[in-house]
Regions:
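PP2C/PPM-type serine/threonine phosphatase catalytic domain
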Residues: 1-287
Length: 287
């Protein structure tokens, strides 16, 4: 299976970026993960990063290929909930962070996904959205009940109120699972935070992704979302995967223009490493 992958995360107009995204590739497929740390709680970025790390550990410990993707998704999301709570208790003082979560397993020509909160998974085919997750949010419930129109969802004053999350509460979240989807060549799977989809409509996203390299189109969409959301633009994060070929189903390869955006923690670690190296060099010169 040959795929094209791109991801991007922009800070928007916020003080820091609490979104995190992960891409895990293995012989039989790939796992895409996205978490939007809750800004109304302390350490949202910790919750989102813990989500990514929990899935990394789970995939490393899983038989290959993943025997039951739905069981893997639900079990790992519930484990992430407990890991986030534990990470919060280790802080001084202890905190109760939370994050949204949307995760997709792509394996042997099929896709399975699960989500908690309002970060979305889309499946685009020929530029058209044939599936998207339903937000676990107050505004989505209003829309489902016919109390507001679809056009009002992204602008409603309570659009950021979610009804489920990973972490924050002692009670485990209810994980919503998709059905298994058979993929075809050209299909594009998109995971994104509300900072991305909130300023763009589905038709606009699908049309753009269907024309050009994912790296270029995804960057353009993210930058457009930030511009439209300014001066209060949220963190804007997305990862997209395109099926180039379904041949060689027992082996997955990603083409060379995969675009990986370094998250802030990695940048901070690199800066500290450079500073330590400079300090060590100065000490040696003084000696």
């Amino acid at each position: 299976m040959q795929i094209e992958v791109s991801q991007i995360s922009l800070q928007g107009n916020r003080k820091n970026n609490q979104d995190r995204v992960g891409y895990l590739e293995y012989d039989y497929g790939a796992v895409l993960i996205l978490g939007d740390g809750l800004g109304g709680r302390p350490k949202g970025e910790l919750a989102a990063q813990t989500l990514i790390e929990t899935f990394e550990k789970a995939l490393n410990n899983s038989p290959m290929p993943i025997p039951d993707p739905f069981e893997f998704l639900e079990g790992t999301l519930l484990q992430a909930h407990h890991d986030v709570m534990a990470a919060g208790r280790e802080q001084i003082p202890p905190v109760e962070p939370g994050t949204t979560a949307v995760v997709c397993v792509i394996q042997d020509g099929s896709a399975w996904w699960a989500h908690v909160g309002d970060s979305r998974c889309y499946l685009f085919r020929h530029g058209l959205s044939i599936y998207r997750t339903q937000d676990h949010s107050y505004v989505e419930s209003l829309y489902k009940n016919g109390e507001i129109s679809l056009s009002k969802v992204s602008t409603h004053p309570m659009r950021n109120y979610i009804t489920r999350c990973v972490g924050m509460l002692t009670k485990e979240p209810e994980v919503e699972l998709s059905k298994e989807i058979l993929l075809t060549e050209g299909d594009i799977i998109l995971l994104c935070s509300d900072g991305f989809w909130g300023s763009l409509d589905d038709a606009q996203i699908g049309a753009k992704l269907n024309n050009g390299r994912l790296e270029d189109t995804l960057t353009n969409l993210a930058e457009t979302a930030v511009q439209l959301g300014s001066p209060t633009a949220d963190n804007t994060t997305a990862i997209a995967l395109k099926i180039i070929s379904l041949q060689l189903l027992n082996q997955t390869s990603s083409i060379k223009n995969k675009h990986i955006t370094v998250q802030q923690p990695a940048v901070d670690d690199a800066i500290k490493h450079i500073e330590n190296a400079i300090s060590k060099y100065k000490d040696e010169m003084d000696d």
